[in-house]
Amino acid sequence: MVKEYKTITQIAGPLVFVEKTEPVGYKEIVTINMPDGTTRRGEVLDSSSDIVVIQIFEGTTGLDKECGVVFTGETLKLPASIDLLGRILSGSGEPLDGGPRIVPDQLLDINGAAMNPYARLPPKDFIQTGISTIDGTNTLVRGQKLPIFSASGLPHNEIALQIARQAAVPGSESAFAVVFAAMGITNEEAQYFMSDFEKTGALERAVVFLNLADDPAVERIVTPRMALTAAEYLAYEHGMHVLVILTDITNYAEALRQMGAARNEIPGRRGYPGYMYTDLATLYERAGIVKGAKGSVTQIPILSMPGDDITHPIPDLSGYITEGQIVVSRELHRKGIYPPINVLPSLSRLMNSGIGADKTREDHKAVSDQMYAGYAEGRDLRGLVAIVGKEALSERDVKFLEFADLFEDQFVRQGRNENRTIADTLDIGWKILAHLPENQLGRIDNKYIQKYHPAHRKGQ
């Protein structure tokens, strides 16, 4: 028998305070029965005292103390089905595309379960994003969690959509899917995401969750968990390789801070909850490959660094949990370069596991190292030129200075719809490395120079 309580004591913003009349669980789902016969859903934020704090998903407009409260005894669940592919849903899993509700094969708890470390397999297969600065110098590996560190006003949304359109595992027999979750976005951004997915045909192999800025903060906490649960279902029940793109983790962390304040928690660094590290880990650690499972879950969380500060708690803590970072540069963006990814502070810690003769190409590591070294030296020389002028440089230094410009203009810069294969990326690398004297290519084995260098290829 379902018990309905009319013990609401206070309504404040998105929160409803209810007098406790029975044991209530943390994160338990609550149904609010409205006087007009409609219902709203909420989630228990705090049940430690005699008053239960409930955050309402749809907001509290129109609620009063006469509304009925039903504690369901359940946590939030995702209606999981292969029919999720091709759908656009709200942050709490409700259809936004005008389609029918999902008829579930299973109802899955969105909080998931911890993955046994012994059951994990080390990531080792290359994922091609079609973006040279990622594939060539900061390679994404299947099962990895590789965040993109961006900032306000930079084109991280465009980069996210380009990856969603182009990502693939070359040579794999398993199907590839993308789960895209956007948190705290404006209506304009939501329309942009939806139209891009539909227009480019990427929606056919994608599940999209959109949480708007004017949606309740509790839904922002739920959205990435919905997305990851959908990804795990597709990976482990249907053997798919799933790439999860989460944007923007900063909005998620702001919602965490808001929820912490609502519960009167003692704040940690810059007002964020002391448990934010653990909470972020519950998201990031759901990436991986499990022994015996055909599928895998790979993550690209995107976060905008407040004030361009890489030491801010959100990127700082994310960096401890994840396996590298892709850094989006305001300097390159000002130059009109897209995608404005700065390879020097960027890093993929698992890159060496996913490249080489049987995965990408035998010369990949050497070309990447040589381009990185050449670009770093060219950038240093720009600082010197600003002081002493270009005329003071040696002929060798001028070559490296010009190499840095070529690297940005030909390797980093590419079209928003340009999908480069790994062979294209490495060939562009060789093309710009040919600008340097051969005796300066000290990081590349001579056999690769003889095989791939444009000067020697012409003679073959």
UniProtKB/Swiss-Prot annotation:
Q: Which InterPro entries match?
A: ATP-synt_VA_C, ATPase_a/bsu_AS, ATPase_A1-cplx_bsu, ATPase_F1/V1/A1_a/bsu_N, ATPase_F1/V1/A1_a/bsu_nucl-bd, P-loop_NTPase, V-ATPase_su_B/beta
Q: What membrane topology does the annotation report for this chain?
A: Peripheral membrane protein
GO MF, any single term: ATP binding
Q: Name one GO biological process term.
A: proton motive force-driven plasma membrane ATP synthesis
Does this UniProt record's set of keywords contain Cell membrane? yes
Q: SUPFAM superfamilies, alphabetically?
A: C-terminal domain of alpha and beta subunits of F1 ATP synthase, P-loop containing nucleoside triphosphate hydrolases
Question: Can you say where in the cell this protein is located?
Answer: Cell membrane
List the keywords (alphabetical): ATP synthesis, Cell membrane, Hydrogen ion transport, Ion transport, Membrane, Transport
A GO cellular component term found in this entry reads:
proton-transporting two-sector ATPase complex, catalytic domain
Q: What is its main location?
A: membrane
Q: Does the keyword Translocase apply?
A: no
- What job does the chain carry out? Component of the A-type ATP synthase that produces ATP from ADP in the presence of a proton gradient across the membrane. The B chain is a regulatory subunit.
Give the matching NCBIfam families.
Answer: ATP_syn_B_arch (TIGR01041), PRK04196.1 (NF003235)
Subunit structure comment from the entry: Has multiple subunits with at least A(3), B(3), C, D, E, F, H, I and proteolipid K(x).
Q: Which family does it belong to?
A: Belongs to the ATPase alpha/beta chains family.
Q: Which HAMAP family match?
A: ATP_synth_B_arch (MF_00310)
The protein's name: A-type ATP synthase subunit B
Name the species this protein comes from.
Methanosarcina barkeri (strain Fusaro / DSM 804)
Taxonomic lineage: Archaea, Methanobacteriati, Methanobacteriota, Stenosarchaea group, Methanomicrobia
Gene name as annotated: atpB
